[in-house]
């Protein structure tokens, strides 16, 4: 089977995955504490809150949570398009966008209860984050939530006994550990800095963006920073993103 990982080399992919998962956990904890238990990246929790709000007739609360879910979905949508169109600049572009959005929320107006405008940039960034990296099957790595990671770890343990687990099995437990550790750090940062703690997550995203920008310039086309993967979660026969980009920009 063709390896559709992005980046192709685990030397950069795994550390990036763990750092970004930690960043997501940190941002989610800050948002949860700052915005009345509203999740920034845990859409399962927000979906439960939406259902409970509808059942109780709390329409402002239901609209608030539904709008966050919609923005997160928009982030995944936009991130996937960026991944497909940015070519070899995929990682730098996505990470710089995420860093900018994590800062932007601090300057946004709060908005009315049903539409928390200052929350949307953070949620958009975390939705976009899930299109940043891919596993060997071309699936987007779930960096901002761990339900899938826990399930894959459990099924991987069973497959370890039955025959051989998938290659992606080994990263699931570290991803859970990174996200939960990030949540602890986010809780501590919020205690001392309040909403301004988002600046720490933005700084981490910017640091990673700078690192991959330098690597892209120094080693263009290297497995450390590139790959032949199609867009995240694309069909098995989809062309690699660089080929997609060339076709789309070729004269008709």
Give residue ranges: language-model regions.
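Substrate-agnostic recognition of the 12-TM MFS/MFS-like secondary transporter fold
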Residues: 51-52, 57, 125-183
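Short, Lys/Arg-rich, polar N-terminal cytosolic tail immediately upstream
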Residues: 1-13, 223
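Hydrophobic/small/kink-forming positions within alpha-helical transmembrane segments
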Residues: 69, 73-77, 176-184
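Hydrophobic core of transmembrane alpha-helices in multi-pass small-molecule transporters
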Residues: 18-28, 37-39, 101, 113-144
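A membrane-interface helix-boundary motif in multi-pass transporters
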Residues: 89-94, 187-203
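C-terminal ends and interior cores of transmembrane alpha-helices
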Residues: 99-114, 213-216
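Helix-to-loop junctions at the C-terminal end of transmembrane segments
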Residues: 75-88, 190-191
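Symmetry-related core transmembrane helices of the 12-TM Major Facilitator Superfamily/SLC fold
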Residues: 96-101, 196-212
């Amino acid at each position: 089977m063709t390896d559709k990982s992005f980046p192709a080399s685990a030397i950069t992919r795994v550390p990036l995955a763990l750092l970004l998962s930690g960043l997501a956990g940190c941002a989610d904890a800050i948002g949860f504490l700052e915005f009345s238990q509203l999740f920034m990246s845990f859409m399962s929790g927000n979906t439960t809150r939406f259902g409970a709000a509808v059942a109780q007739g709390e329409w402002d609360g239901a609209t608030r949570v539904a709008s966050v879910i919609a923005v997160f979905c928009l982030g995944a949508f936009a991130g996937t398009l960026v991944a497909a169109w940015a070519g070899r600049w995929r990682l730098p572009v996505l990470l710089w966008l995420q860093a900018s959005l994590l800062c932007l929320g601090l300057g946004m107006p709060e908005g009315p209860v049903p539409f928390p405008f200052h929350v949307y940039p953070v949620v958009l960034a975390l939705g976009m984050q899930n299109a940043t990296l891919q596993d060997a099957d071309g699936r987007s790595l779930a960096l901002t939530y761990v339900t899938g990671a826990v399930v894959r770890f459990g099924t991987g343990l069973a497959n370890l006994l039955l025959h051989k687990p998938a290659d992606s099995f080994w990263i699931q437990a570290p991803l859970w550990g990174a996200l939960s550790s990030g949540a602890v750090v986010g809780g501590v940062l919020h205690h001392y800095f309040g909403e301004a703690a988002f600046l720490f997550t933005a700084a981490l995203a910017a640091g990673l963006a700078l690192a991959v920008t330098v690597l892209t310039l120094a080693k263009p086309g290297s497995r450390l920073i590139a790959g032949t993967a199609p867009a995240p979660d694309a069909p098995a026969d989809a062309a690699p993103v660089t080929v997609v980009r060339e076709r789309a920009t070729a004269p008709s």
